[in-house]
Amino acid sequence: MDKVTSLDKFRIPIGNQEIELQEFVFEAGGMPLLRTRIRERSRFTIFDIDPATAAHWGKVLCAWAETQPGGSGGKEEAV
């Protein structure tokens, strides 16, 4: 059976979307993926990201956050 481990779950203050990040490991083997689940009311958007894409995306998110008022680049916990 495939293994899904929840890494974090939080709500976005504006829009109230729920974000859940999960590690998804296939029973058959292969590369683990980062599953991103975005919930808006009853609608879900789910996509899987490979490690290289996750690293690139994370760097861009942190760089942007550091340029914004109150941004910490992911150095403080989400509320």
Residue ranges and their predicted role:
Residues 1-79:
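Positively charged, low-complexity terminal tracts
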